[in-house]
Amino acid sequence: MCTPDENDYKTSTDPDTSANTNHTLEKKKRKKRKNTNVACVNCSRLHVSCEAKRPCLRCISKGLTATCVDAPRKKSKYLAGIPNRELPMNIQPDLPPRKIMIPIYNNSSNSSLNVNNMGEQQKFTSPQHIVHKAKFLSNAADSEYSILSNIIYQDTLSNKIPIDILYSNTNSTSNSTIGNSSNNSPTGTNTSPEETEMEKIRQLYSEQRANIPPHPYPSSNQNVYSILLGPNSAKIVASQVNLFANHFPLVPVDSADNSLSFKRLLPRDPSEKSSQINWDSSINQYYLNSETVTFPELAIPLKRRKNHLVSVSLESCSPDAANIKSNVEWEHSLRYSTPMEIYTSINAPFSHTPGFHHLLVYLKHRFNQQDLVKMCRSIAEFRPIFIACSVTLTEEDMIFMEQCYQRTLLEYVKFIAQIGTPTCIWRRNGQISYVNEEFEILCGWTREELLNKMTFIVEIMDDESVRDYFKTLSKVAYRDFRGSEKMKVCRLLSPIKGKIIHCCCMWTLKRDVSGLPLMILGNFMPILN
């Protein structure tokens, strides 16, 4: 048997080997080819090639230059069922720019109006202006989620679409009224975005309350805020601005005699001085009440007797004074004193949106950026829980939640009146909803001063306590469901400037039927040593 020579292997050509070599060379050539251009809308519809520049040559020849824009890219599968207009701008598919859809006429007034509209559309279609409209079944839940998103993402409302425009029907008369007033205003071009937005919110609020009978202006009979709202207190009271819709923080006042006589209208008895401190030397005991002597006024006497055991006693009030106090005009507080009134009279949900908005504005004026970021992180933990609990809630459910709040608050008020522990109740946005008489005596702020306007619990805390407040809030409300937590630091600010009450504060969280934080009960006890 003859064997082939070695040269035969070298000179012979294998067809399979040459084919594989050619295939490898073709692959290398394919890798080096240029990326294909994104076709325009017209070329993509006809499945023909397109060039990079706009308008392309084919659209120029066909006379379709006005609509020659990049074809929108395919959306992700999890966004397939959501319309493009309801998506946040940062995840919307690439759409044709809207500026070419606005014709500019020769008329000067029309052209200026169209240019303004073009600028406004470009502003709201810019990626820097994130617009979110969650698919909640309740307008109240939509509004609250929107303000939480605004707080977390950019900490400002100046470059967002106003909530009253974003979450209202396009064919409503209120929106057209607001739009016309803003466009026809002669000073509209000179106002800042924040002022324009606040003006729209005020107009919307006035329209919403147009059908509600007028209520007495807060503190119309007693000017309790004439000196407690800072240097401009008198002007604020004289302007009769709605203190429930606009926030003005409480400001401590300098007191020469370290008493609260500067804000007491009349003493209980004409023969009794308002600054008189009742003291029983035989048992080293002070007697306090909410009308004449409160705990902050004992700062100096307690320092003098710091080496002695001192006790504090509260003067008992009459049975009539211990009745349940409700006010129909205080929407954030206890409005009715019977369950029947609660279930028959409450027909609208309570909006937490203004409270969150004003809380953020207040924190911005009080704290630096570093502290503000930490507080916003604590608030950010609330968003996923809010989505999970509220996505299926309807407007009727939100009304029922407010009825549950009022009904629960009514029962707690009865219970708190029998305990005697200084207690303050606030909503999940920090707005104070109820205080008992013992809390008035402890901090020096009266019930009318705290509830007759929009007041946040952080207003009467020092800076370190506010920082710990948001840490405690994230623990008790969002991380676990124990329902109780103790603040590490709690120091209350009294109406007397410089007088701080060191306290031990224990939180008790009450949730609604959907799991959302309904109310927070804070029990405060003074630290005497």
Curated annotation (Swiss-Prot):
Pfam families: PAS_13 (PF24990), Zn_clus (PF00172)
PROSITE patterns membership: PAS (PS50112), ZN2_CY6_FUNGAL_1 (PS00463), ZN2_CY6_FUNGAL_2 (PS50048)
Top-level taxon: Eukaryota
PAS domain: residues covered: 408-480
Keywords assigned: Activator, DNA-binding, Gluconeogenesis, Metal-binding, Nucleus, Transcription, Transcription regulation, Zinc
GO CC terms, sorted: nucleus
GO terms classed as biological process: cellular response to starvation; gluconeogenesis
Entry's localization field: Nucleus
InterPro entries according to UniProt: ERT1_acuK_gluconeogen_tf, PAS, PAS-like_dom_sf, PAS_13, Zn2-C6_fun-type_DNA-bd_sf, Zn2Cys6_DnaBD
UniProt biased composition (Low complexity): 174-193
Residue spans of biased composition, Polar residues class: 14-23
Molecular function via GO: DNA-binding transcription factor activity, RNA polymerase II-specific; RNA polymerase II transcription regulatory region sequence-specific DNA binding; zinc ion binding
Keyword Chloroplast: no
Function: Transcription factor which regulates nonfermentable carbon utilization. Activator of gluconeogenetic genes.
Protein family according to the UniProt entry: Belongs to the ERT1/acuK family.
Name by which UniProt lists this protein: Transcription activator of gluconeogenesis
Species, as recorded: Saccharomyces cerevisiae (strain YJM789) (Baker's yeast)
Originating gene: ERT1
